[in-house]
């Protein structure tokens, strides 16, 4: 959704100017959770027959000052433009841009057995040195089929230091030699 991406980009710019990048991030995802789980909000938000002024007033009462004025103004703008549906997309575009700015990277760590925080700290230092990853968010998965070692997946990069990966590489080389 191009419109949702534009709203997210505008919020990022505003968040940078106002020093509220993280506040906007938290509140947008809070908003997403409300949309998923709160029937009262959904009844108000997705009622296209309700007058815009009434909807704005009810949204303001619903949040009762627990929301940043810029986010509230975004909600008002979406109501005015009759673009309520795109509120569900804005947080994800915002997160994508926000993560790039602050250096957050989701790193899938595949290991043959559980690892401790000391190993994750070493991986974190290595990622910073080798790839400039400042804030890795580790998603650890245990996969006994890799036999040993470790496999990292992030930003379309695969670092395979597993025993299975090494054996697969050797097998490919042997097949090449056998074909020649």
Curated annotation (Swiss-Prot):
InterPro entries: ATP_synth_OSCP/delta_N_sf (IPR026015), ATPase_OSCP/dsu (IPR000711). Keywords: ATP synthesis, Cell membrane, CF(1), Hydrogen ion transport, Ion transport, Membrane, Transport. It is a peripheral membrane protein. Coiled coil: none annotated. The keyword Membrane applies. GO terms for cellular component: plasma membrane; proton-transporting ATP synthase complex. It is found in: Cell membrane. GO terms for molecular function: proton-transporting ATP synthase activity, rotational mechanism. F(1)F(0) ATP synthase produces ATP from ADP in the presence of a proton or sodium gradient. F-type ATPases consist of two structural domains, F(1) containing the extramembraneous catalytic core and F(0) containing the membrane proton channel, linked together by a central stalk and a peripheral stalk. During catalysis, ATP synthesis in the catalytic domain of F(1) is coupled via a rotary mechanism of the central stalk subunits to proton translocation. This protein is part of the stalk that links CF(0) to CF(1). It either transmits conformational changes from CF(0) to CF(1) or is implicated in proton conduction. Belongs to the ATPase delta chain family. F-type ATPases have 2 components, F(1) - the catalytic core - and F(0) - the membrane proton channel. F(1) has five subunits: alpha(3), beta(3), gamma(1), delta(1), epsilon(1). F(0) has three main subunits: a(1), b(2) and c(10-14). The alpha and beta chains form an alternating ring which encloses part of the gamma chain. F(1) is attached to F(0) by a central stalk formed by the gamma and epsilon chains, while a peripheral stalk is formed by the delta and b chains. This is ATP synthase subunit delta. It comes from Caldicellulosiruptor bescii (strain ATCC BAA-1888 / DSM 6725 / KCTC 15123 / Z-1320) (Anaerocellum thermophilum). The gene is atpH.
């Amino acid at each position: 959704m191009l419109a949702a991406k534009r709203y997210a980009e505008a919020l990022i710019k505003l968040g940078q100017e106002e020093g509220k990048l993280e506040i906007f991030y938290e509140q947008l995802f809070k908003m997403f959770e409300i949309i998923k789980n709160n029937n009262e909000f959904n009844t108000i938000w997705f009622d296209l027959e309700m007058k815009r002024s009434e909807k704005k007033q009810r949204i303001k009462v619903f949040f009762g000052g627990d929301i940043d004025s810029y986010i509230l103004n975004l909600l008002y703008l979406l109501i005015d433009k009759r673009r309520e549906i795109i509120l569900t997309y804005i947080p994800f575009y915002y997160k994508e841009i926000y993560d790039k700015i602050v250096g957050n990277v989701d790193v899938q760590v595949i290991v043959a057995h559980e690892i401790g925080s000391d190993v994750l700290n070493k991986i974190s230092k290595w990622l910073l040195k080798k790839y400039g990853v400042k804030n890795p968010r580790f998603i650890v998965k245990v996969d006994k089929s890799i036999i040993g070692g470790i496999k990292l997946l992030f930003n379309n990069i695969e670092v395979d230091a597993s025993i299975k990966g090494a054996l697969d590489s050797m097998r490919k080389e042997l097949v090449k030699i056998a074909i020649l």
